[in-house]
Amino acid sequence: MSAVAEHIATQMPAPIVFTDSAAGKVKELVEEEGNPELKLRVFVQGGGCSGFQYGFTFDEIVNDDDTKMEKNGVMLLIDAMSLQYLVGAEIDYKEDLEGAQFVIKNPNATTTCGCGSSFST
């Protein structure tokens, strides 16, 4: 990689914000499973009351078209189709009176449902 390309690559912001809270919870869950090869896969699929819904799963396999992000020793994977809906989003983990859950704050969503797991663009 040329010096210019390397400089540009280091200056470009990450397409997704993966918070310390989310990475910490994923790390905790991976340690509980006892499988250090597990990575958090975030995806978008059709469905939900607003047209699209978010999904989270653990995966050991990294596909060629996956965008990979690492934070605090944890790997986040997003497939190419889902990435177009998630660019600029923040993936967080919240614990409050309503419970504990992974949350996506998506600036691309024009409508969201009350539970926050469904959206439209």
Swiss-Prot record:
Keyword Metal-binding assigned: yes
Domain of life of the organism encoding this protein: Bacteria
Entry note: cofactor: Binds 1 iron-sulfur cluster per subunit.
InterPro entries, A to Z: FeS_biogenesis, FeS_cluster_insertion, FeS_cluster_insertion_CS, FeS_cluster_insertion_RrpA, HesB-like_dom_sf
Cofactor(s) listed: iron-sulfur cluster
Any one Gene Ontology molecular-function term assigned to this protein's record: 4 iron, 4 sulfur cluster binding
SUPFAM superfamilies assigned to the protein according to its UniProt record, in alphabetical order: HesB-like domain (SSF89360)
Keyword Metal-binding: yes
Regions that span the bilayer: none
Keywords assigned by UniProt, alphabetized: Iron, Iron-sulfur, Metal-binding
Binding-site residues for iron-sulfur cluster, renumbered to this chain: 49, 113, 115
GO biological process: iron-sulfur cluster assembly
PROSITE patterns assigned: HESB
Cited HAMAP family: Fe_S_insert_ErpA
Role played: Required for insertion of 4Fe-4S clusters.
Family of this protein: Belongs to the HesB/IscA family.
Assembly notes: Homodimer.
Protein name, per record: Putative iron-sulfur cluster insertion protein ErpA
Organism (species): Methylibium petroleiphilum (strain ATCC BAA-1232 / LMG 22953 / PM1)
